[in-house]
């Protein structure tokens, strides 16, 4: 902050927060990462409820790559066709919600490992759509001089702030729920 106040840093410009797209992009990333923290429930369910070992749990994570590929293709094709951002964002959050509903109604009742991969693929598809769109949305009307600042904001919110808040919320919820059983 000292370097930014004295204007010795060309990388972090606090004027970037005056742009609505950057503020909305940071808020969307924060919301996305808080929602994405619910993925730890998949690992808890797989480890505790289904008694999977670490290798099976890690191989379940490999199915994320399929979801990321599907999400990237959907985002590029529909974005290239000029579909409005609000519909693409709604589609991404729909996939995240669909994954949670699938986990609740399909996987939880049956407890079959093979069905768990579909929930992982659906969630990864929604996450990839939202990752791509949030970055593209903030870059839409942003002057080039704020690009490095936007990248710094995006990485800070995505890697530090969002997962910390989401992890704290879901850990407290999980701990509170365990006290009743």
Predicted segments, located by residue:
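Membrane-helix boundary/linker segments in multi-pass transporters
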Residues: 1-57
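C-terminal module of multi-pass small-molecule transporters
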Residues: 61-181
């Amino acid at each position: 902050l000292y370097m930014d106040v004295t204007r010795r840093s060309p990388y972090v410009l606090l004027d970037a927060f005056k742009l609505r797209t950057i503020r909305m992009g940071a808020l969307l990333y924060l919301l996305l990462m808080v929602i994405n923290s619910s993925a730890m429930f998949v690992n808890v369910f797989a480890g505790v409820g289904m008694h999977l070992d670490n290798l099976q749990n890690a191989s379940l994570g490999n199915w994320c790559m399929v979801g990321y590929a599907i999400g990237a293709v959907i985002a590029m094709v529909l974005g290239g066709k000029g579909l409005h951002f609000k519909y693409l964002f709604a589609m991404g959050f729909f996939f995240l919600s669909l994954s949670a509903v699938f986990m609740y109604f399909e996987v939880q009742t049956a407890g079959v490992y093979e069905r768990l991969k579909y929930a992982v693929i659906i969630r990864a598809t929604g996450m990839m759509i939202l990752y791509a769109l949030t970055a593209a949305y903030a870059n839409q009307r942003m002057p080039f001089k704020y690009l490095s600042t936007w990248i710094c904001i995006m990485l800070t919110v995505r890697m530090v702030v969002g997962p910390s808040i989401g992890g704290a919320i879901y850990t407290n919820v999980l701990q509170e729920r365990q006290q009743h059983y």
